[in-house]
Amino acid sequence: MTVLVSLSGISKNFSGVQALKGVDFDLRAGEVHALVGENGAGKSTLMRVLAGEMKPTSGTVSIHGETMQHSGPRGAAGRGISVIHQELALAPDLTVAENIFLGRLPRIVNHRRLRKAASEILERLGFDIDPAIHAGRLTVAHQQVVEIAKALSNRARIIVFDEPTAVLANTDAERLLAIIRELRAGGTGAVYISHRLNEVFDLSDRITVMKDGSHVETLETSATDVDAVIARMVGRQMSALFPSKAGRVPGEVVVRVRNVSRGRKVRDVSFSVRAGEVVGLGGLVGSGRTEVARLVFGADKMDSGTVELNGKPLHLSSPREAVRARIGLVPEDRKQQGVILDAPIRINTTLAKIRSISRLGFLDAGKERQVAVALGAEMRLKASSVDAPVSSLSGGNQQKVALAKWFHADCDLLILDEPTRGVDVGAKGEIYNLINDLAKAGKAILVISSEHQELFGICDRVLVMAEGAIVGELTESKFTEQQLLTLAMTRSARERDETSQ
């Protein structure tokens, strides 16, 4: 197989700090090579060297067997290298077509030809996106597609995907992964950076693990497993990330959901969660788990059924009422719904219970800071100060801020929807400890996760959903991925058969 890229002995120093230490890496034509490691491992820095965004302190970059001199991003693009960053770089006020060909537009633009060329590339990717609309009006998923179209228009044969699914819903993420598979089949070489190890194993041919700026090992994906990769990333296996459940004693029922329905999304769902208990909601994408969470939180209105909190019926018409009832929700899309990115940490952490830091209707800034500092210490938050905007934090620390908000609110029931999505492995372990501490303190916790090991590692029970209904319950003695998938997939297949008859 042809080697497209060879990085040899790449080192990079920043003011005496060695970010990369003699790293070797290569990429072949028609493969997806995953690059994994904790935040700060050096993954993005290495790819910025490849993309010409940084000049290495030492080492060589070879493209198609030819050693290249550093010539900046434009030079790298000219050699067929493109990077799809997590933070997208489209010009929102330009059209889709203009974005795709940006930097290569003639002085006099024939917009009809431009739109036609853009449409042809988008159709190759399987998306019907109007090339004439402004990029700022697109969903995040469609913006990702336009970024890929831009790379293809530049005849890129080497594409780096840096956390491409971090802000995407599951269905959009699946479509993006399908595009990457098609690119691979056409001979493109792709570097895939992600904390989502399930995606890494589903997509990649090889996996390179980095730690503290060094190359640890490159593995054939088919010859390794998640535990082996995690052990190389953090020095311990996945199972070691989960805290002991000893000391968690389930008490009285905190929340009881009875026969709740909403259209075909949620159908006759009933369950309960006790104080000091962590209950999981598992199932396939689209099974109705998030919809159940939104109904319990008052974000959506149920067609029928009841929710009781501490033995009393709840009649929630909004999330505001849920917060007053001491119910909290950390949503799956933390950047859009869980935190205010541009606001400082101190505002985000106290937002759900702002009355507790107010006096006579006025905010007590000193108390706000005091609470935020205390929460930051409890959460082991890594930030320069509580005045720093949440947008400046890593994914794991952003998630800690989202959790801190509900720690401060002192909820009786906390719903966590994909609590470690887009979070590195080390931060996952810290979040699992926080969840465990809440349970030990007597809080009722409902966890939704697409990572089965996560559900089994932190939950006392797992309810399995399919086609909007709860189809089974797994206790610890039956915690296996096979059991969960058998319940989820058998019911899903049966429902589809019944619908088609």
UniProtKB/Swiss-Prot annotation:
ATP binds at G37, E38, N39, G40, A41, G42, K43, S44. It is a peripheral membrane protein. It comes from the Bacteria. Residues 5-237, 249-492 form the ABC transporter domain. The keyword Amino-acid biosynthesis does not apply. Keywords: ATP-binding, Cell inner membrane, Cell membrane, Membrane, Nucleotide-binding, Repeat, Sugar transport, Translocase, Transport. It is found in: Cell inner membrane. Transmembrane segments: none annotated. The keyword Thylakoid does not apply. It catalyses: D-ribose(out) + ATP + H2O = D-ribose(in) + ADP + phosphate + H(+); D-galactose(out) + ATP + H2O = D-galactose(in) + ADP + phosphate + H(+). Belongs to the ABC transporter superfamily. Carbohydrate importer 2 (CUT2) (TC 3.A.1.2) family. Part of an ABC transporter complex involved in carbohydrate import. Could be involved in ribose, galactose and/or methyl galactoside import. Responsible for energy coupling to the transport system. This is Putative ribose/galactose/methyl galactoside import ATP-binding protein 1. It comes from Rhizobium meliloti (strain 1021) (Ensifer meliloti). The lineage of its organism: Bacteria, Pseudomonadati, Pseudomonadota, Alphaproteobacteria, Hyphomicrobiales.
